[in-house]
A protein has these predicted regions:
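N-terminal leader/linker segments that initiate helical-solenoid repeat arrays
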Residues: 17-68
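Bacterial N-terminal signal peptides
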Residues: 6-16
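Helix-turn-helix repeat elements of alpha-solenoid scaffolds
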Residues: 29-42, 76-86, 120-126
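Short coil/turn linking the two alpha-helices of tandem helical-hairpin repeats
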Residues: 65-74, 110-119
Length: 150
């Protein structure tokens, strides 16, 4: 087989298959609140695979939690913006994935906190509409109901 063919087709497929194994460790680090460790691993993967929605989703989640635990407002805002940037990219790749949609709503809600009242009202309609869709797709996910204040 041609070496170039292997490099462009076989090797990326191999690494795509191994992602599921890598995600279990990353997900464990996320659940253990090791956000900085997780971020380093995810950024390395994202450099290799910039259009992988699973990597983008986890990058968004990581930045969301870094934003939530930030002490300084500047750090909070920067991480919230990064969280939205990553999930917006994942959303553009697959807007029907329930977890992508859930975290899109969360990140959007966080970023509108800094907007004008008018913009917040406009975005709240979009957030409500998307939240209802997320609840429909993930009816057992308590986080979804929390988004809607239920």
């Amino acid at each position: 087989m041609n070496l170039l063919l292997k490099i462009f087709f076989i090797i990326p497929i191999y690494y795509s298959v191994t992602f599921a194994q890598d995600f279990s460790k990353i997900d464990k680090d996320l659940s253990d609140l090791n956000f900085n460790k997780t971020l380093i691993q995810l950024e390395e993967l994202n450099n290799l695979y910039p259009n992988n929605k699973d990597i983008l989703l986890r990058l968004s989640i990581t930045h969301h939690y870094l934003s939530e635990k930030a002490i300084q407002q500047k750090e909070d805002k920067e991480n919230a913006q990064k969280a939205f940037k990553y999930i917006d990219h994942a959303f553009s790749l697959n807007s029907e994935d329930p977890n992508v949609l859930k975290w899109y709503v969360i990140a959007l809600g966080k970023t509108v906190e800094e907007e004008s009242i008018r913009k917040q009202i406009e975005q709240s309609k979009k957030i409500e509409q998307l939240s209802l869709k997320v609840i429909e797709l993930l009816p057992d996910d308590e986080f979804c109901y929390n988004i809607m204040g239920q």
